[in-house]
Amino acid sequence: LIEKHSFTDVIFLLLRGDFPNEKEKALLEAMLVASVENGLEAPSLYIPRVVAASGNDMHVALASGMLAIGSKHGGAVEKAAEFLNDHKEERAEAVVEEHIKDVIPGFGHKIYKEGDPRTRALYEKAKALGFPCRFFDFGFAIEKELEKKKGKKLPLNIDGAIAAVMLELGFDARLGKAFFLISRIVAMASHVKEEMEQKNSYYRLDETEVQNEE
């Protein structure tokens, strides 16, 4: 393995059970790049810095970042993959009609309200590599129907895009959080290292930032 294969090859071997072809390898690497970093504002990146600044070791700070992953941040991939896979044989219009009152995982973003650029980049990469992009196309169809029914745009977000790539590559939906963390932990380590190099004291909220309820 050490002589002949890359880290990406080993990810496929351990999580799918076989080695990838070159196109599969390229798409997974693109997905991992898309997930690695999206600004200090993300909970999985600033929380490790707070923990590191409090005097903790690298592994403790990294663990805090992992625990920051939840249904509202990085943790919707599994549900999005399950949703896309469960409904892939249905028409997008019928799916949205059935779930119009639900929060459909993998759609909508706090910042990218008109469209997540990471989603578009992964879709274009998959297309260029020759993948059928069945799950991407289904996701975009749901996006259009959501806009029709709700009157506002809820774009396929990065969680939905990662879900589409995972399914395209034949991975189990339950690996969603694992893939996000495989990528994100690199950025976590970078931020923790940077924090450890600072001479600042630990972070503490100012009294004006705390709302007291009487």
Question: PLM features: what roles do these ranges have?
Answer:
Residues L1-E214:
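Non-transmembrane, aqueous-exposed alpha-helical and coiled segments at domain scale
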